[in-house]
Each structure stands twice: as C-alpha cells, then as structure tokens.
From Swiss-Prot:
Belongs to the NALF family. It is a multi-pass membrane protein. Auxillary component of the NALCN sodium channel complex, a channel that regulates the resting membrane potential and controls neuronal excitability. Its main location: membrane. The gene is Nalf1. The keyword rRNA-binding does not apply. Signal peptide: none annotated. The lineage of its organism: Eukaryota, Metazoa, Chordata, Craniata, Vertebrata. The chain crosses the membrane at residues 40-60, 426-446. Component of the NALCN channel complex. NALCN complex consists of NALCN and auxiliary subunits, UNC79, UNC80 and NACL1. These auxiliary subunits are essential for the NALCN channel function. Disulfide bonds join 200-270, 235-322, 255-270, 313-350, 333-386, 339-385, 343-370. This is NALCN channel auxiliary factor 1. It is found in: Cell membrane. PANTHER family: NALCN CHANNEL AUXILIARY FACTOR 1, TRANSMEMBRANE PROTEIN FAM155. Glycans are attached at residues 160, 226, 254, 462.
Length: 467
C-alpha cells in the first residue's frame, strides 16, 4: 500500500513534470508565431494602404483634370454662343441696311429724272447712258430667266431684283449658300435646290465651248445658269452636274445631260429627275437622323477615344451615307479617294456600341462593320469621292460662322489613361495582395509544422529517461 501510494505520488509528480515541461518550452514558440503574424498583418496593411493611396491620388488627379476640361469646354461654348449672337446681330443690321437701300433705290426710280425724261423723248445723252449704267449695276448679278422677257423696260429691274432669292414665279426660294464647296462652283455662286420647277425653267449653260462659239461669232454671250452651282439640301457636296452626268437613271428615269441641256426640252422629265434626286436626299437625311438618335441614346460619354469624337463620326457617316445613295464621281475635289473607303473611315472613327443584351457578349467588335470591300478589286469604274481628311484641313472658314473644326472636347492624356487604368490598377493591386498573403501564410504554416515535429522527440526522450 505504501509502495503503491508512493508510486501513485510518483506518477502524479511525473505527470505534473510531463505536463509542465512542454508548457515552458511552448511559450517561446507561441510568442514567435504571434510576432510573425503581427508582422505579416502590419506588412500587408502597409502595402494595401500604399496601393490604395496611390490609386486614390491617381483617380483624384484624373477627376480634377476632367473637371478642368469640362469647364474649359463650357467656356468655349459660351464664347461661341456669344460670337453667334454678335454675328446674328450684325447680319440683321446688314439686312436692315440693304432693305433701306432698296427702298431708297425704288423711290429714286419712281421719281422722274432728267436723263429718264430725255431717254423717253428719244434723245440719247451721255447723262442718260450713265444713268442706265448706274441702274444696271444696282441690280443683282444673277442671270435672268428666259420666261421673264416681255413687258416694259421699267419692269425688268424689278424682275431681276426679285430673282435674288426666288427663281421664276415659284414660292419656294433657292437659298444662296454662305460659301461654295472647296473648288466648287465655277461662277462662285452656290444655290440649294428647293423647287424643281424653278430649276428646270432656267437657261442652262453647255460649258466653255458654247461661250467660245458665241465669242467667235461676235455675239455677246448671254448669262446662263451652270449646273455645278446647284447643290442638294442635305448631301450638299453633290451638284446637279455630277448627278446628271453620273446618276442618269434614278427610279428608271432618263436623266442624262442631253435631256436637261436641250433648249426648249420637256420640263416634265427634268422636274421628275430633280424630284427623284430630292427623294434620295430626304431618305439619306432620315437615316442620318436615326443614326444621331442611336448615338444620343447609347453613347454614355463623348470621351470614347483620344483621336476621335462624335462630331468626326457624324461627318464621315454622312459622307458614307450620301455616297451610298448617290454613286457618282465628284469632280470639285482637291483630292479624291474611292467612295468605298468612307466605310473604313466610319468604322475607325465611330464608337463601339454594344447591344443591350447581357446574354450575348461581343468581344471587341464594332457596331459598324464594313463588308464586301475585299471581295472585288477596285477598278477604274469605281466612283471616286472627295477626301474628307484633306477637305477638313484645308477648307476655308465660312463668313459669318464659327469655326467648329475644334469643337470636339479633347481630353488630356492623364484623363483618358486614368479612366482606363483606375479599375485595372485596383484589380492588379488586390491580386498582388492576395498572392502575397497566401505565400506568407504558407511559409508560416511550414515553420509551425517543422517546430512541432522537432519538439515531439524531446518529449518522448524525457519520458523514457524518467522511466
């Protein structure tokens, strides 16, 4: 009993010694592991704060630059609006002055003058001739209508003045454009086709050959209209000369130059041809308005590209659309390119508009894709159009208008790069942080397992030694 009790005490003492020894040996391991974990957590926290601060600073700088660009763009728009208002006021003042001058001229013509009395009496004096020259110079430079002949001499000046905005007896005016297309009208006068009857009633010119024939005969050439002076309303880079010479059969009609230039020819054919051209022009305008509505609906921001903007996209899309409706060669161009190349310009300048469908994913595909360009080789029969890039760079600024070639909001490189790099930079930082955390945890786990396995044999050795 005594030996058994002593053995039990010895067992208890040995048990106490066996339990207490690993606790004393375990404290330094626990402290080192805790210190290592604290170091890892502090390192990861420091790394994350550095990356986050860099990200926030970069995005804040991009936001500041974006706001500056917007303010600058708004200031430019306000300045353009002020300039437009000033120009409108100047135009109104000029119109008022012209109206006053016309009224004064009418009053002077109504009042009897000595040269007019002498001319009515049959006497041709130098004063009468000078008065005729002055009255003729005050009339517009537009050529007269062939149907406007007849009547007294006093009514001819009024008819000529009325033709400044109206052709013939039509109620629809043929507005004169502010500037001609680059190297466009030969006479320097550009008009928009509005009334087919008024246009077909003109005495058309056959070109320089007719003028040489008349000069050789000794007769004075009568002022004639030129087909290259009349443009369409929407596709305003196409003249009637180009349409009649290239698109001679719109809607199964015979619209050749011989039909139009024939003196005393049928006006019905000419009117039908011009109306067919106007229908094509209206259809092109409707398609362009649909494209504008799509851009306005789906394009969230104008800053979709560094080199292009919506205005550039609309310009090339309009040129491509008109070239599809009017497959003719343009003559009045500084530089020509194949009309099919307009499609590539639209594809490169217009934005990518993805469909509103989450199930279908389009990876890097444009909403406007050119097809059929490389199936057939370009031949000499392909129509050629004006190069928009050279025309935009060298086109003169119209009078009374604001220069809109730089109207696209050009953002700085920091803004465009920040909008693309901020989300990607954040994802990269998070990925690096996760990889660093996994590597450190794996190394810590290996160290803890190595220490644990190294301590077990020492405990067994102690127990065997005590036995």
């Amino acid at each position: 009993m005594t030996r058994g009790a002593w053995m039990c005490r010895q067992y208890d003492d040995g048990l106490k010694i066996w339990l207490a020894a690993p606790r004393e040996n375990e404290k330094p391991f626990i402290d080192s592991e805790r210190a290592q974990k604290w170091r890892l957590s502090l390192a990861s926290l420091l790394f994350f704060t550095v990356l986050l601060s860099d990200h926030l600073w970069f995005c804040a700088e991009a936001k500041l630059t974006r706001t500056r660009d917007k303010e600058h763009h708004q200031q430019q728009q306000q300045q353009q609006q002020q300039q437009q208002q000033q120009q409108q006021q100047q135009q109104q003042q000029q119109q008022r002055q012209q109206q006053r001058q016309r009224q004064q001229q009418r009053q002077r013509q109504q009042e009897p003058s000595w040269p007019a009395l002498l001319a009515s009496m049959g006497e041709s004096s130098p004063a009468a001739q000078a008065h005729r020259l002055l009255s003729a110079s005050s009339s517009p430079t537009l050529p007269p209508s062939p149907g406007g002949g007849g009547g007294s001499k006093g009514n001819r000046g009024k008819n000529n003045r009325s033709r400044a905005l109206f052709l013939g007896n039509s109620a629809k005016p043929v507005w004169r454009l502010e500037t001609c297309y680059p190297q466009g009208a030969s006479s320097g006068q550009c008009f928009t086709v509005e009334s087919a009857d008024a246009v077909c009633a003109r005495n058309w010119s056959r070109g320089a050959a007719a003028g040489e024939e008349q000069s050789s005969r000794g007769s004075r050439p009568t002022p004639l209209w030129n087909l290259s002076d009349f443009y369409l309303s929407f596709c305003n880079s196409y003249t009637l000369w180009e349409l009649f010479s290239g698109l001679s059969s719109p809607s199964t009609l015979n619209c050749s130059l011989d039909v139009v230039l024939t003196e005393g020819g049928e006006m019905t054919t000419c009117r039908q041809c011009i109306e067919a051209y106007q229908d094509y022009d209206h259809h092109a305008q409707e398609k362009y308005e649909e494209f504008e509505s799509v851009l306005h609906k789906y394009l969230q921001s104008d800053e979709y590209s560094v080199k292009s903007c919506p205005e550039d996209c609309k310009i090339v899309y309009k040129a491509w659309l008109c070239s599809q409706y009017f497959e003719v060669t343009q003559f009045n161009c500084r530089k020509t390119i194949p009309c099919k190349q307009y499609c590539l310009e639209v594809q490169t300048r217009c934005p990518f508009i993805l469909p509103d469908n989450d199930e279908v994913i389009y990876g890097g595909l444009s909403s406007f894709i050119c097809t059929g360009l490389y199936e057939t080789f370009l031949t000499n029969d392909e129509p050629e159009c004006c190069d928009i890039r050279s025309e935009e760079q060298t086109a003169p600024r119209p009078k009374g208008t604001v220069d809109r070639r730089d109207s696209c909001p050009r953002t700085s490189l920091t803004v465009s790069s920040a909008t693309r790099l901020c989300p990607g930079r954040l994802k990269l930082c998070v990925l690096v942080l996760i990889l660093l955390h996994t590597v450190l945890t794996a190394s810590a786990a290996q160290n803890s397992t190595g220490l644990g396995l190294g301590g077990l044999p020492t405990l067994e050795d102690n127990s065997t030694r005590e036995d």
